[in-house]
């Protein structure tokens, strides 16, 4: 860890700034110590990597995932080529296409969540210059250390930390792009993880995520059943229900043999906005807004027929007739006059 990392890292719970308490320092690098939040929460630094994992007692699924990846660093890198070989894909070409979706420039600030051993990280790093910024985080110390070794010597300033994807230790609206491929389905709370990615992204930033999921039209094929026999994660659904309301320009496609999904989107601000006050022509009339907010209690069928005849005789829309009649009746009963 470098002291400059304090400009980026924050408490994953409150986003307050952190104070460094140095244990061991070597050539300007912090080897051990503590990061302390304004609220007094302490996060250790071990072997040069800050551990900002929250909560300290992870949900069972996340704990199991961490233990799994901590135990298979060697096998992961040695065998990952099988995923691409099975589907006749070139790993380097595929990863570069994924990173293309981030629309980076050399000065971009980029976060990779669940960066693993750095196979995508080095592609991202190759797109960034010394005025850019790359932050890599993972829940597994073993995987993150391997990624750190892979990226030794890259030009872009790089920050490494351990964290839970549900509580990212970065400030609001900081990054130009966020990337996570191959881990989303293993997060215990996908909705919260995606919301956190949005929180740390600037308005307009690009987010790219993906993982295993055989599409519905292939689920009953022999092709799918062969894959699922070895890896049940292919049964996972695409997390469309978990997508944040801030997602704009959403693109979903299937990649790597058509059995992994890739979602990319821009970050918007809050819910989408629309002009709901445009007068709608026709018998019903009104606007989208009045049709939603202006609903009244039901009337009897006989009264409804009278209203329809009266509206037709006056030759106005139903909205105009109801607005006028109800307004006049309300003012009369209240003993008030129409304001000019």
What do these predicted ranges mean?
Residues 8, 24-78, 325, 332, ...:
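N-terminal, positively charged/glycine-rich alpha-helical extensions of SAM-dependent methyltransferases
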Residues 54-105, 119-123, 143-146, 206-231:
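Conserved class I S-adenosyl-L-methionine
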Residues 109-167:
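Class I SAM-dependent methyltransferase SAM/SAH-binding core
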Residues 166-177:
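A short acidic, Gly/Pro-enriched loop at the edge of an enzyme's catalytic core
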Residues 191-206:
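A short glycine-rich, Lys/Arg-flanked "PGG" loop and its adjoining helix->strand segment in the class I
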Residues 230-248, 261:
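Short alpha-helix
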Residues 306, 314-340:
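Short, basic amphipathic alpha-helical segments that act as recognition/interaction helices
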């Amino acid at each position: 860890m470098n002291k400059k990392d304090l400009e980026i890292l924050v408490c994953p719970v409150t986003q307050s700034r952190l104070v460094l308490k140095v244990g061991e320092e070597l050539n300007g690098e912090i080897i051990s110590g503590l990061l302390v939040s304004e609220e007094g929460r302490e996060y250790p630094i071990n072997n040069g990597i800050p551990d900002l994992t929250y909560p300290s007692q992870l949900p069972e699924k996340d704990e199991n995932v961490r233990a799994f990846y901590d135990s298979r660093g060697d096998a992961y890198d040695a065998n990952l080529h099988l995923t691409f070989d099975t589907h006749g894909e070139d790993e380097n070409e595929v990863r570069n296409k994924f990173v293309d979706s981030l629309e980076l420039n050399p000065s971009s600030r980029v976060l990779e969540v669940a960066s693993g051993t750095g196979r995508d990280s080095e592609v991202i790093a190759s797109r960034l210059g010394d005025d850019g910024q790359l932050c890599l985080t993972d829940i597994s110390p073993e995987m993150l250390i391997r990624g750190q070794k892979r990226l030794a010597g890259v030009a872009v300033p790089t920050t490494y930390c351990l964290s839970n994807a549900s509580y990212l230790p970065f400030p609001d609206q900081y990054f130009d792009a966020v990337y996570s491929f191959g881990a989303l389905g293993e997060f215990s709370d996908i909705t919260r993880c995606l919301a956190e990615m949005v929180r740390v992204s600037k308005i307009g930033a690009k987010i790219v995520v993906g993982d295993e999921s055989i599409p519905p039209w292939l689920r009953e094929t022999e092709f799918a059943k062969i894959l699922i026999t070895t890896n049940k994660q292919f049964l996972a659904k695409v997390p469309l229900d978990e997508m944040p309301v801030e997602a704009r320009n959403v693109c979903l496609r299937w990649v790597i043999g058509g059995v992994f999904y890739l979602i990319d989107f821009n970050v918007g601000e809050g819910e989408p906005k629309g002009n709901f006050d445009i007068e709608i022509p026709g018998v019903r009339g009104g606007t989208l807004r009045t049709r939603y907010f202006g609903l009244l209690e039901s009337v009897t069928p006989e009264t409804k027929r009278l209203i329809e005849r009266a509206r037709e005789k006056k030759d106005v829309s139903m909205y105009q007739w109801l607005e006028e009649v109800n307004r006049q009746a309300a003012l009369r009963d209240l003993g008030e006059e129409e304001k000019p």
